[in-house]
């Protein structure tokens, strides 16, 4: 059975992507300073997913260019939405088997980096990922509103139907 925290991550990813519905390439690449553009935000979350669930968890780095272009503190850029969405989709799909196999005891295990236990545990990384998605979901909605987009999705979607609270 999939851990409830992983189910919440999946719902959060879905809501993040729902916030991109109807967004064209040109608007996805527009920067309203000092914010990054929406497409950069997608790449940034792909970077974090890859870092936590592929690199830290499985020692895989399938998209080194994502690691370089969208890491925390990386310079602003205006990538195409199609490019970063495709990378995001591949990264999140590659993370699924690992996420599906997590147990509560796995989630309190320390992340090992450079052969040494770090101060992080996997459950906290999942929480960090969830909260980071919501941060950028709100930022993306603000950018879209500033660009004059209307009839945007309301949040937090159908949490009661799709991701209600479930005990372990």
Predicted segments — roles?
Residues 1-5, 74-77:
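Short, charged, low-complexity loops and linkers
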Residues 6-10, 17, 25-71, 113-168:
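Short, contiguous alpha-helical
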Residues 24, 99-103, 144:
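A structural signal for long alpha-helical coiled-coils and helix-turn connectors
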Residues 73-113, 120-135:
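Acidic/histidine-rich alpha-helical segments that form the ligand environment
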